[in-house]
Design a protein with these regions (language model features):
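Conserved, structured core segments of small domains
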Residues: 1-124
Length: 124
């Protein structure tokens, strides 16, 4: 089953961290990603650019409203993700707990809901 591991962290805190800490974190993420690839669970993963360059889009009454910045002002921001394929939620949680981001922020584990399961007529 596929799971999305969402990585939340405090952007301001990460930006203020010493350069050496950033280098160490990058190395830790590189090792983590390689471990996922070697285990055959890695499908995709990327870091996201800072929320200050994000755009929020809403459509109401046929009108598109575009707002600079993220949807919500929170202490932790979505900073990256991994898409993995593992047997069950326990395995996904195990991989999330090993992510370097789990030690500095919050990991959210979301099962992927294949469209064929909830809209079979549209995927035939």
């Amino acid at each position: 089953m596929q799971y999305l591991l969402l990585i939340y962290s405090n952007e301001a805190g990460m930006a203020a961290a010493p350069k050496e800490a950033a280098v160490q974190m990058s190395a830790a993420y590189g090792a983590y990603t390689e471990a996922m690839k070697k285990a055959g669970v890695f499908l995709a993963g990327e870091r996201l650019k800072p929320t200050k360059i994000a755009t929020t889009v809403r459509v109401a009454g046929g009108k598109t409203n575009v707002i600079d910045g993220p949807y919500a002002d929170t202490k932790e921001q979505l900073g990256g993700y991994y898409l993995i394929e593992v047997p069950d939620m326990d395995a996904a949680i195990s991989w999330a707990a090993r992510c370097p981001g789990a030690g500095t922020g919050t990991m959210e584990v979301r099962p992927i809901w294949p469209m064929a399961e909830y809209m079979p007529a549209y995927t035939a």
